[in-house]
Amino acid sequence: MKKLIFGIFVAFLITHCSSDKNEYLIKIYDAEYDEIGVPSCYVNSKGDTVVPIGKYYYCYTDTIRNLGIVIENKNGRIIGIDKNAKELFEVFKYDNGPDYIQDGLFRIIKNGKIGYANENGEIVIEPKYDCAYPFKNGIARVSNKCSTKKSGEHSVWESDDWFYINKKGEQVEKQ
């Protein structure tokens, strides 16, 4: 508990001079190490708790400027939240955690479809693809008709209708 109070105090001192526009949240946890399952919360520069302890099963993001990534308690979804704790979208699960940011974008999910968001928490390409790989060099391989096949402990996507899109969601030729 002393660490939690100390952490809140430090967060207050560090961010005391910030304006609302530059406001951000700092993750505080009551344990020696931050690991999945350790209760944590987010506080603002005034020391006010914005996200209470235990609201989420795990908080991946240590400082929320625009976007925080957390795991819900009730069903284990990985979601993006803003600095007001508003849910923005569900994050695509990859390698037992949230999708990696590549080329400034990461994958999100809505109603079983995949789209893309940026590091600011803005949806750049609405979820509309059945399968979608990460962006690399400005393009991503996607499909509207694909199936998932098990390959050992991993899964692979198969499709006869792959195509490429740019960061605007426009279909392009592979370069």
How would you label these PLM feature ranges?
Residues 18-175:
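Residue-level detector of conserved, function-critical positions
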Residues 1-22:
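Bacterial Sec-dependent N-terminal signal peptides
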